[in-house]
Amino acid sequence: MPTDRKRRKSDRQNVAELRTRLRESASFPRQVIAEIQRAARTGIYDIRGFGAKRRIPTFDDLLFLGASMSRYPLEGYREKCATNVTLGTRYANNPIELKIPVTVAGMSFGALSAPAKEALGRGATIAGTSTTTGDGGMTPEEREHSKILVYQLLPSRYGMNPDDLRRADAIEVVVGQGAKPGGGGMLLGQKISARVAKMRDLPAGIDQRSACRHPDWTGPDDLKIKIQELREITEWEKPIYVKIGAARTYYDTALAVKAGADVVVLDGMQGGTAATQDVFIEHVGIPTMPALRQAVEALQELDMHRKVQLIVSGGIRTGADVAKALAMGADAVSIGVAALIALGDNAPELEDDYNEIGSSAGYYDDWHEGRDPTGISTQDDALAARFDPVLGGRRLANYLRVLTLETQTLARANGKSHVHSLEPEDLVALTIEAAAMAKVPLAGTDWIPGHAKF
Amino acid sequence: MAVEFDLRQKSTRELNAALHRLNGSGDTGTWRIRNPHGLHTLAVGVDAPLTIDIEGHVGYYCAGMNKYARITIHGNAGPGVAENMMSGVVRVTGSASQYAGATAHGGLLVIEGDASSRCGISMKGVDIVVQGVVGHMSAFMAQSGRLVVCGNAGDALGDSLYEARVYVRGTVASLGADCVEKPMKDKHKQELEGLMNEAGITGADAAEFRRFGSARTLYNFNVDNADAY
């Protein structure tokens, strides 16, 4: 008769042995199995927020060379490294002047609570940059708290009106976004509160699916006239941006320039969304890094680089990302998901609250459900009241300043007195994929895949 | 005395700038604009109760985002006439191209001839009265307001519409997803008569119209509607 102690020991051995014999399928790992089970249970595709979660080539696969014998660095604290950006120099009578090369991307009131929108405005204003409306119109809160506010013209035209056009500092015609190039907006019934419904002229509580195409223009020839209309209404004062999701970026950038854009906003596939089908987020569009290179090539070919400014977004997290994007030819970058995280999204202090809604800090992406314990991605008044827009704004400003300081650090290390002086020649790639996509050489070689030498 | 403006002598920019100088003024003056010759973006962004007569055909987006003004186009209108209008009255004595009254939030758009496809697309409170026919996909995703069609309607009328009401006197080639015929009650006849009076349309009897609106089955996701998605 085995003793209890012996039996427990043998059970442990059996379990340990079993574990080593269990083999997870590469084709059907647990997350895939769970999704099939979820689909079979519900009959509807998975909708979520956040951006692409799959592993893709990113700016992390690039390195700066720095300075040494052949290049002079700048002194870290004594020699100035400027960060200012001017947007809209092509046609606008009143171009936008930013203190830093980082802007806050369009996120709607509806997707976000009113205090969260206010915080974005506060943070951007403290840091000397712009923030952007979204698919739902302009709220008085965000206008009041944003020194520089970009007003989006989207296919839905929710809340679009000439008074807000005139109140805006720039106008962004949204053709697409990186999370879903070719997809329209989505806001589920849980977030269509009475105020959101009124602003969008929709019945409260419906599952809103916005149009993916603009209602009154098709193609760049029409868009050119649409942009002319916007300029006429606003006396040619305001820069007109055209935002595209990263798809056929070379051609799309060239066509945006042809249509008369002052600024092209390019959003890569890592770009965030408040609510989109998971299959769309993960399988449509190209990463930010290769898209950026294609956009810059299109601008250079048209002799429009630095004349039509380029803002790139999608997966910008650190000053290293900012500096690399600028080195590849962007004039500025834009942040969305990172800005929400700076406000407090996915905060570990709220782990218990996240657990209660079936998630965990660091994983939470069900922004479409409106149950956000931080009060950011919700229209529930009680949840929204938890969010402090002054503190949120301060945190965003801090984060924007860190991004800027990090960018300056890298620019100085490469001997640049302005962040715009960073250039592709300052970069090398760590992987063959990144070398091919960014068209910079593999580190330690002069090899750019697909690039024959002359 | 009407203000005379000749687009052979002055530019579109000069016209719009001159009109915008009166924005917010409450000016009720009359403007006569000659020789439009199909130019785009004429009289856009007006924000005053002016009476504006445009003597000829216009291109894209004429009277776009209008507030308060009564703008009459004595001719045909290109795409997007009165797009995103907020208030006022825009009248086209001829026919209108695609997306007439697109996304308009208020006011009245009268088209005395025919309107092409996507008339009233994403309309958000405007009233549109068309004396002739409308093309396909009219009132697509129409949110609110009323579309009155005295002639026939093309394919996929009212596809995915929300709370807008659509009245058609002639035939309807086909209805779009979630658009259904609804009973014409007395209050609808009264509403229709009021709209036709306001539009100055005579010779059409409200009793001859049918009413269409949303079946509201696509308002919330439902697996059983997958065939309609």
Segments from the language model and where they lie:
Chain B
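Beta-strand repeat architectures
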Residues: 20-30, 40-50, 61-69, 80-87, ...
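Feature marks extracellular polysaccharide-active and adherence modules
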Residues: 34-36, 53-57, 64-65, 74-76, ...
